[in-house]
């Protein structure tokens, strides 16, 4: 899996995402690898390369890039479906979704928060 993750670094959108995350969160090498593994799993799930996912969601216009609503909705639904098939706890499923959403968000595709994890006994 490490080779597949290293190959993902060749994608401009992955580089943009990880650079932005690193500026915000100072990822450890282990956290960086986990993010790459989750994104690789999602891309395999939807059968699309990272750059294709972002290109599909953004459209060039004379005024700049705009978000394609249908594509954004499609990928939001795909992230929800991807989360559901992750083995493990609800917390892990939510974390996988957050990682994939962060990839889109850091590349200019705004999304809703998606599933939230709240331990039992926690109120709003």
Short names for language-model regions:
Residues 16-30, 36-123:
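N-terminal core-binding DNA-recognition domain of tyrosine recombinases/integrases
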């Amino acid at each position: 899996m490490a080779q597949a993750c290293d190959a993902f670094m060749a994608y401009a959108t992955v580089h943009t995402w990880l650079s932005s995350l690193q500026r915000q969160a100072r990822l450890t090498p282990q956290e960086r690898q986990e993010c790459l593994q989750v994104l690789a799993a999602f891309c395999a799930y939807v059968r699309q390369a990272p750059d294709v996912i972002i290109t599909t969601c953004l459209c060039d216009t004379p005024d700049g890039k705009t978000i394609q609503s249908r594509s954004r909705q499609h990928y939001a639904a795909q992230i929800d479906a991807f989360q559901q098939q992750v083995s493990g706890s609800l917390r892990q499923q939510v974390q996988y979704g957050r990682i994939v959403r962060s990839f889109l968000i850091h590349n200019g595709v705004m999304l809703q928060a998606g599933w939230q994890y709240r331990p039992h006994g926690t109120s709003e």
